[in-house]
Curated annotation (Swiss-Prot):
<dbReference type="GO" id="GO:0008792">
    <property type="term" value="F:arginine decarboxylase activity"/>
</dbReference>
<dbReference type="InterPro" id="IPR009006">
    <property type="entry name" value="Ala_racemase/Decarboxylase_C"/>
</dbReference>
<dbReference type="InterPro" id="IPR000183">
    <property type="entry name" value="Orn/DAP/Arg_de-COase"/>
</dbReference>
<dbReference type="InterPro" id="IPR041128">
    <property type="entry name" value="Arg_decarbox_C"/>
</dbReference>
<dbReference type="Pfam" id="PF17810">
    <property type="entry name" value="Arg_decarb_HB"/>
</dbReference>
<protein>
    <recommendedName>
        <fullName>Biosynthetic arginine decarboxylase</fullName>
        <ecNumber>4.1.1.19</ecNumber>
    </recommendedName>
</protein>
<dbReference type="GO" id="GO:0006527">
    <property type="term" value="P:arginine catabolic process"/>
</dbReference>
<keyword id="KW-0663">Pyridoxal phosphate</keyword>
<keyword id="KW-0620">Polyamine biosynthesis</keyword>
<dbReference type="InterPro" id="IPR029066">
    <property type="entry name" value="PLP-binding_barrel"/>
</dbReference>
<dbReference type="GO" id="GO:0033388">
    <property type="term" value="P:putrescine biosynthetic process from arginine"/>
</dbReference>
<dbReference type="Pfam" id="PF17944">
    <property type="entry name" value="Arg_decarbox_C"/>
</dbReference>
<comment type="pathway">
    <text>Amine and polyamine biosynthesis; agmatine biosynthesis; agmatine from L-arginine: step 1/1.</text>
</comment>
<comment type="similarity">
    <text>Belongs to the Orn/Lys/Arg decarboxylase class-II family. SpeA subfamily.</text>
</comment>
<dbReference type="InterPro" id="IPR002985">
    <property type="entry name" value="Arg_decrbxlase"/>
</dbReference>
<keyword id="KW-0210">Decarboxylase</keyword>
<keyword id="KW-0456">Lyase</keyword>
Length: 637
């Protein structure tokens, strides 16, 4: 393809749309990151960045964080709501609350909080959904607005700690998820002498569409029904504490792709708010929860991996709907809170690792079968002869299907002992030759050819063995078929020569990335430059900053990867800071209650028993190094 251009690469990988301007492809075919939108001219080539890290002793795979992206996401979301509030003359403000469950890493939380350090009145709070998360935010929320929202199921200790947060100077909203929690709150607040700030989670009838739609609707795991909400109001009235009810919360689910779902959910919840006000409750905060989506595939659609709206449209719809409902009821407009953790964090992190080997289907030249060979092989040779003789376009599909049928029959005959191993191998190579030839002759312009093209792209794709664990670094790709953009980090200035699938290094057949962003759609293979064992071939997995680290598991005892924070200074200098080593072998053994120290003693006993004295020290040293080493592959020499 001689007319290939960088624009073709940008369109082919759809970088312009899913990257939100943070990532791109340079004119030299290198994937770049521009973490600071204020200075878009300052770019880092990810390939060179990774090489610099390796030279500095940071082994791949490495998770690279760009904190300036976090800063931009926080401020752009606040700005979108501020502009919507001004546009619709909304009579209250907006507060962004970060739910730390999305990414609890200290670096991430601190950078999010630091994003508004210069603001006189920060528009930022924190959310906790468990006791450990609450203990964390109690020590960090004062760096922003000191607002803490407590969600999740609660016991007396959780509630007591939340109330202690009020004594520490925080504004802690305890959101009731179950009716039984109210009794505990009333009792603990009385013991501590603290007036609680109560919220309640409404269980809406409306249910948004998406992978997390079970978070909303009448069968939701969380929230109070209309009748239960009225019971809460009655009990608070009886205790002369109705003024404590200050926040209404609802949650449609993470990654809501359709803006109409958001409008409908806000509309229903807005009526809950106004009805509560009319009952005498002092509710003044309207928490829309999560749902603000990330366009993982860049298609701007209603697919589970995308969204059909932008940030401005999201803020405008929430503010507009709530303005109209409050005006209809003649009720004061509440502070709007959102818990948009996925939006804040997804883009800021990219996993960079290396391809350690490939397996390609290379068709061999075949000779006609011997005259005494089974008729089936002669049929396959006839199909190959038709293709090599440039068969009519209309016959291509028929020839392909005949070849597939013949191959299946050959494999069956081999299993019955009626075909030799050599004859089976010949049949497989003949089929492979037919597939390669058909692939080159089919046309995407012919709609009857397209399914066969997709099938052949998958069948003939190279296998790239990539130094990472899907279960540790991209668990949502395995668990819920989440799409993450995947790109080779260099060589994109030339037309891709191959199509490939990415396989991890676990001993599990599920350890494969089976969906790839390709143009304006999702494909089962990825167009890539050819791999060479002579030079490093680096791959980037993008938009992995939300949920993936904390959800990752240690399948095959592959642990946390190395990580690093990278920042571009105002003078354009790249600064690699706070490199954090990933798990060692000893670390992951300890997680599953295996004692590396005891293992070392056992090694010594075995060495003394089986190894000659002059070799013992070297063997023991290698075993010691093995326990201290990275869980991923490092030595390819």
């Amino acid at each position: 393809m001689n007319d290939w251009s960088i624009d073709d690469a940008r369109a082919g990988y759809n970088v312009t749309h899913w990257s939100q301007g943070f990532y791109g492809i340079s004119d030299q075919g290198e994937v770049t990151v521009s973490p600071d939108p204020k200075n878009p001219e300052y770019k880092i080539g990810l390939n060179e960045l990774a090489k610099d890290m390796v030279k500095a002793g940071v082994a791949l795979p490495v998770l690279v964080r760009f904190p300036q992206i976090l800063h931009h996401r926080v401020n752009s979301l606040c700005q979108a709501f501020d502009q919507a509030i001004q546009k619709y003359e909304y009579q209250a403000d907006y507060l962004l609350v970060y739910p730390i469950k999305v990414n609890q890493q200290q670096t991430v939380v601190e950078e999010i909080l630091a994003s508004q350090a210069s603001k006189e009145v920060p528009q930022l709070g924190l959310e906790a959904g468990s006791k450990p998360e609450l203990m964390a935010v109690l020590a960090m929320a004062q760096k922003a607005s000191s607002v803490i929202v407590c969600n999740g199921y609660k016991d007396n200790e959780y509630i007591r700690l939340a109330l202690i947060g009020e004594k520490l100077g925080h504004k802690v909203y305890i959101v009731l998820e179950k009716l039984s929690e109210l009794k505990m709150v009333l009792a603990e607040s009385k013991r501590l002498g603290v007036t609680p700030r109560l919220g309640l989670r409404a269980r809406l009838a409306f249910q948004g569409k998406g992978k997390w739609q079970a978070s909303g609707g009448e069968k939701s795991k969380f929230g109070l029904s209309a009748a239960q909400i009225l019971t809460v109001v009655d009990q608070l009235k009886q205790n002369d504490m109705l003024d404590s009810l200050q926040l209404l919360h609802f949650h449609l689910g993470s990654q809501i792709a359709n803006i109409r779902d958001i409008r409908q959910g806000v509309s229903e919840a807005g009526r809950f708010y106004c009805e509560l006000r009319e009952l005498g409750a002092s509710v003044n905060c309207f928490d829309v929860g999560g749902g603000l989506a990330v366009d993982y595939d860049g298609t701007r659609s209603q697919s589970n991996n995308s969204m059909n709206y932008g940030l401005t449209e999201y803020a405008n719809n929430i503010v507009n709907v709530l303005t109209d409902i409050c005006n209809e009821y003649a009720q004061p407009m509440p502070r709007i809170i959102s818990e948009s953790g996925r939006y804040l964090t997804a883009h800021h992190a990219v996993l960079i690792t290396d391809v350690i080997g490939t397996e390609a289907y290379q068709p061999e030249n075949i000779q006609p079968p011997a005259e005494e060979s089974p008729q089936l092989l002669h049929n396959m040779w006839h199909s190959w002869s038709e293709i090599s003789g440039r068969a009519d376009q209309r016959a291509l599909i028929e020839i392909y299907h005949d070849s597939q049928s013949d191959l299946q029959e050959a494999q069956s005959l081999f299993a019955l002992g009626q075909l030799s191993l050599a004859e089976r191998a010949w049949a497989e190579q003949a089929n492979l030759r037919v597939c390669h030839e058909v692939q080159g002759l089919l046309s995407t312009k012919n709609r009857y050819h397209r399914p066969i093209i997709d099938e052949l792209n998958e069948k003939l794709a190279d296998k790239f063995f990539v130094n990472f664990s899907l279960f540790q670094s991209l668990p949502d790709a395995w668990g819920i078929d989440q799409v993450f953009p995947v790109l080779p980090l260099s060589g994109l200035d030339k037309a891709p020569e191959r199509r490939a699938v990415m396989l991890d290094i676990t001993c599990d057949s599920d350890g494969i990335v089976d969906q790839y962003v390709d143009g304006q759609g999702i494909e089962t293979t990825l167009p890539v430059p050819a791999w060479s064992a002579e030079s490093p071939y680096l791959i980037g997995f993008f938009l992995v900053g939300a949920y993936q680290e904390i959800l990752g598991d240690m399948h095959n005892l592959f642990g946390d990867t190395n990580s690093a924070v990278v920042r571009i200074e105002e003078n354009g200098v790249t600064n690699i800071e706070s490199v954090l080593a990933g798990d060692t072998v000893a670390d992951v053994l300890r997680y599953v209650n295996l004692d590396a120290v005891a293992f070392m003693r056992t090694y010594e006993e075995l060495v003394n028993l089986h190894i000659e004295e002059d070799e013992r020290a070297q063997i023991l040293e290698e075993l010691q190094v093995g326990l201290k080493g990275y869980t991923y592959l490092e030595d390819f020499s």
